[in-house]
Amino acid sequence: MRKRHLRLGQQMWALLCKNWLRKFRMRRETLLEWLFSLLLILFVYQLSSNLHQVHDAPEMSVVDLGRVDNFNDSNYMMVFAPESEATHEIMNKVASAPFMKGRTIVACPDEKSMNELDLNYSIDAVRVIFKDTFSYHLKFSWGQRIPKTKEHKDHSAPCEPLNNKMICENSAFWEKGFVAFQAAINAGIIEMITNHSVMEELMSVIGSNMKMPPFIAQGGVATDFFIFFCVISFSSLIYYLSVNITQERQYMTTLMAMMGLRESAFWLSWSLMYAGFILVVAVLMSLIVKSAQVVVLTGFMVVFLLFLFYGLSLITLSFLMSVLIKKPFLTGLAIFILTVFWGSLGFTALYKHLPAFVEWTLCFLSPFAFTTGMAQLIHLDYDVNSNVNLNSPNNSYLIMATLFMLVLDALLYLVLALYFDKITLSKYGHQRSPLFFLKSSYWFKRRGASHVVLENEIDSDPSLNDSLEPVSPEFQGKEAIRIKNLKKEYSGKHGKVEALRGLGFDIYEGQITALLGHSGAGKTTLINTLSGLSPPTTGSVTIYNQTVSEMDDSDAVLTITGVCPQSNVQFGFLTVRENLRLFAKIKGILPHEVEQEVQQVLQDLEMENIQDILAQNLSGGQKRKLTLGIAILGDPQVLLLDEPTAGLDPLSRHRIWNLLKERRAGRVIVFSTQFMDEADILADRKVFISNGRLKCAGSSLFLKKKWGIGYHLSLHLNEACDPEGITSLVKKHISDARLTTQSEERLVYILPLERTNKFPDLYRDLDRCSNQGIEDYGVSMTTLNEVFLKLEGKSMADESDVGICGRLQSDGARDMESLVELEQVLSLDSSGSSVSGMALWRQQLCAVAKVRFFKLKNERKSLMTVLLLFGISFVPQLLEHLVYKVYHKSYSWGLSPSMYFLSPGQPPQDPLTHLLVINRTGSSIDNFVHALRQQGIALDLDALGTRNGTEEALYNGAITVLGEEKALRFSVACNAKRLNCFPVLMDIISNGLLGIFNSSERIQTDRSTVFEEHMLYEYGFMSNAFFWIPVAASLTPYIAMGSISDHKKKVLSQLWTSGLYPSAYWCGQALVDIPIYFLILFLMQIMDSVFSSEEFISVMESLLIQIPCSIGYASSLIFMTYVISFIFRNGRKNSGIWSFFFLIVTIFFIIATDINEYGFLELLICTFLVPPFTLIGSLLIFSEVSYDSVDYLGTSESQLVFLALLIPYLHFLLFFFILRCLERYLRKKSLRVDPVFRISPRSCPAVPNPEEPGEEDEDVQMERVRTTGAMATLQTDEKPVIIASCLRKEYIGRTKRCFSKMKKKIATRNISFCVKKGEVLGLLGHNGAGKSTTISMITGDTIPTAGQVFLKGSGGGAALGFLGYCPQENVLWPNLTVKEHLELYAAVKGLKKKDAVVTITRLVNALKLQDHLKALVRTLSEGVKRKLCFVLSILGNPPVVLLDEPSTGMDPEGQQQMWQAIRATFTNTERGALLTTHYMAEAEAVCDRVAIMVSGRLRCIGSIQHLKSKFGKDYLLEMKVKTPSQVEPLNTEIMRLFPQAARQERYSSLMVYKLPVEDVRPLSEAFFKLERLKENFDLEEYSLSQSTLEQVFLELSKEQELDDFGEEANSSVKWKLLPQEEL
């Protein structure tokens, strides 16, 4: 063991390097991340350069606006409502105003009739609407006589230079008549109420703008947009950060934590990297802000710190959201939405003055705090006298407080992320109490605490004593792992699920322990609990007296433990070496030992040749080896391995077994597996778990003796054998022997274990019967598979192929009946009820369309994108419509003193001030002042008249009272920053005069705006089409690119193999895609019509034009997308990129083909040549073509209209033809004649093999002779179903140099074999032996370089129609149900609907899939998926079936069901099957014959017993003694009886030997000797077993080909036997 110290710094640096490598290796993601960021920065820079305006205004002098009655405008009329005596009286007095002479005044009954009044738009209408006698509002057309904005923003310019003088916006009230109309109406109201005329007093009011100090103002809306884009400037970086973190937390962080990863190292690694990214963007944004003068007076460092702290707060916010939200995309989306929403909320600080408490509370939202900070900088710029400097305490308080809040936000989000990470339930069940931080145990680790056994931890199941083998004396006291009453519960959909139910046993140092059980038994849960990945519900687990569930002991446990979880643990963007180096540092291996340890692991697992390959490019088996390598880093004392050899070929699996055996001494190795032979060969102790409970535990010998069904006697026969006679002979010696398997070449019997004393006589008689057709025989012990099935309550003898293949002898008639029924169901011939030709094409078309509809319905992401784009297409129209609705509805803006002036006793509040009143009458104005105070205004009175109102810029407004006491005159001065100041002061003066006359009433004036309807809809229906048609063109990639995923999942290849017509596939897709796309287009047109202002008839006419164009456009664009998806089928789907491409192309040609500039001919050409532009081009032709253009082209208008309508249909036919050509020349060969595409099956020419067979095994030579004879025979009925003759396949390899000779790689060399009717031939070989290439040549995916393939007597499979193929991967649609899959393949293979229902029902019942028919495939277990793939392969009764690893991933029970089904499907039928597998037990159970490939050649072929006898080198002898003292004498006797015996295991009670075949033969003599040993030494039990097929395969796989692939094709083959390893 290596020393391991978990160091935070080492882990953080390792993860940081990993993150940088991720950015470098995943260039596409990094490019998009920075591209979006830089584009946003460039856009902000462009916005600031072109649109942003900064007004650096100098000091502005007083502007005199003159008297109110100076207004003189004749181009208006007045309209008032409602019509009453009071309003008539008021308006009659208004008519007496000087500026009203000769003006028309119109009365309306109410406001509604006023709006309906047909006015001449050339004359401005001043609308006066009275609420009551004292309240009214003046209503003007939008933008007429009053400013467009309701109020100045604090950062906008109140005055702008024009013709060398400053023009202030508030002057419009004075100069364009609003104040004049207001004064006249107010005078009329006062005179009506008081009978005193004040017309002269109000008409003589003099207005002026106050002197204004210098100011810096921003340019309105552009500034708002600029700030908004500053808020989202980090969005791209933060989005990818949140996605990356959420992905790692979801898949890797917990697994790395059980290897010792510190949480803080994980967060720091991402923080440091993205802090650097934030730093770069913050510098760039700060430079733009300063260069664009968005902030002028504030220093660069302050702006930079504002951006930097804001970016850092977003980093920690992404940490928090990644903890709360588990989906990567949703995390990124949520952060973006929160950033936009909170940032937009911050604009209230720019426009409104919020209460301090509310503003500082909202600053806990960092985007709000950032927007507030930007607003503060802009406000401080607004006054030249203020400045921001970090060293200036007087002016920098607010911005310093904002910076502090951003830092506080970052820390707060980080603390919350760490807190919620602790208390939220993790994937594996970790969760702390919400108040965990209040417990002292969290902060202070307990020292020297010893484990106390609690009452609920004591094992309480004494009934298991008989099922547990006693531990050998040498292991007593070496209990390394102690499991006490372990229970684990999960919360499932239907309540709590008990994964472990009171499990309790010990695991010992120096032993390899295997955990066995069915799927869902609790093996993985137990491994996760032992590793600390999943905490137990109750009970305890201790590893070397350290409690796994105690956090205090976690470091001690982690430093001695290595874990290989069920899922692969590696980063795909790192190489093998980099992955090992990363995890070595995480595990705390000392830095100077890391490289040495990594190199050692690479050597141990033989991965030196792949050490520089990215993990994502490794095969499944190589990834598994890498995960195991990560587990054994640091040579841990405890190894916990969850299915460590899953997906490995037998040779690699065997090497790992040897590695684990070498590391067994002084260590604890626990592994789970569903591969019983692995447990039998590798494990010293097997622990069976069933439904979370311990079933039994012990050595193989103990388990087989107690639960085994007996010895297997296998006989290899020839044609002269009489099976009946052999059975009689066996039963004469052992009456209770059972025949389990019978075929032409073999018989298999089960002999009870207790009858070993009868074996010598039986084998002696068998040796004498060699002339009766017995070529060879062998004996093997019961397997752990049989033990497993018996423990699960099922007998392998009853569940295997007993009676399916021939004669069945079973203890129960019920089992016999069920198995015979299964054989009848699976061998059912449905070929007579199939359809063909156009009827089959129509059936396939409907089936594909149905599946396409279901797929589209379940593709939520694509549907959401389509709906989003659909909505986006109408955003401009909707906004236009909303603007109209908002402005069409009259709104009032109340004008009151509280807008600008404080009330008495009110504390100072920016921007309110006192109202300055200056008395220059020379007498008292107490009555007027009293009337002002009665309005609730705080006054600042200058009774002596020494102050000048126009010089007082600190006030919002000032009133100077002139004249005499009874003939007062007024002068008003306004601060230009207060937009509505003049109307407010006019109301104040009017109410003051009203108060002088002792009236308590108050006049209230409101300003109002009306939006004229004629201002909307200026461009007609085509203006809206310019928005929605480009978006519509961008929708097709999201609808019609499903074939790419079908191709990548190999579903298309499976469909072609099953006999699907290519044209039926594409047309079936189009049958759904085109109507859906047309429906979207139609809805867009309907929405366009809804927003249109045209009359109903015009709308219907435009729809009649658009609909036929849209049908053709939908068809052409969908098929164009099909062509694109076919061409780029091997790449990514990239729907978004193609959508963007279609959008840009359409917009470009809309701009480029402006008919007024380029003419009709260019428009017609672009419409024809650019399919995405076709729809809008056709509509433009209909809507814009003039008669002059028609005459110029020399044709009639009707013909042009027809041509425009025809263009999309011509595109559709063109793309349909292109798709047909692509299918014909680029796709694999078709198995049927396509009636639409007219594609016929292509026959491959027979090319003679240039290489002679050379030296071959005699069985291989005989098979080659049989293959040649089968090809030559003319009798079709006698031909095998598969004939592979002299197959050779060469691949052209890549070269590193441009002019070097291309190297040839030969995958297969001169392969010849045949599969007879009713036969299952197993094709075995290690990875790279050529199995997959051979299968590809048989299916037609790969064309042989030489040789021929005949399927059921016809070369190339032309007459076959379809193949049955069960690939290794589950080529299924995850979002479709089992029933939908079955119905599709039944239709594709030609079964009529009525017959398909019956066939599907029978197959589903036979394979026990009834409960899963309506379940989605993604919810199924691996075993059910494999069953479904098998059913799909045999559906339709195909004569040729190819089975590639049919039972991979299934538990032993599921495997037995699958093997039984395979045997029942092919035995005694006209069908044949070729099966490839890495699982030798599967080959033994299913195959009639086995062919083993080595380096592209057939090494051997024959029955299993024949290969065992011919290539098996050893027998395995196991003996268990009762007392240790017998070991040495027994060993001496064994060596005397079997001189070449090699001892394998050295335990005190268990003795294991390898016996060469020479020492064992004859078997009768070997068993005679063993029986004598049993009697003389009082053995508890013994077993003698022949080499398994696994061991034969391993021996043959050691032979490696030495040919250089660059040699000529006729080079000879050399074989080398590598050094023998232990088996």
From Swiss-Prot:
One of its GO terms (cellular component) is mitochondrion. Residues 481-716, 1287-1520 form the ABC transporter domain. PROSITE patterns: ABC_TRANSPORTER_1, ABC_TRANSPORTER_2. Glycans are attached at residue 120. The chain crosses the membrane at residues 31-51, 225-245, 265-285, 295-315, 329-349, 354-374, 398-418, 863-883, 1025-1045, 1071-1091, 1107-1127, 1135-1155, 1163-1183, 1199-1219. One of its GO terms (molecular function) is ATP binding. It comes from the Eukaryota. Its EC number is 7.6.2.-. Highly expressed in heart and to lower extent in kidney, brain and spleen. Weakly expressed in developing and adult brains. Weakly expressed in the cerebellar granular layer at P14 and P21. SMART domains: AAA. Its main location: membrane. Keywords: ATP-binding, Glycoprotein, Membrane, Nucleotide-binding, Repeat, Translocase, Transmembrane, Transmembrane helix, Transport. ATP 1 binds at residues 517-524. Transporter that may play a role in monocyte differentiation and lipid transport and homeostasis. This is ATP-binding cassette sub-family A member 9. It comes from Mus musculus. The gene is Abca9.
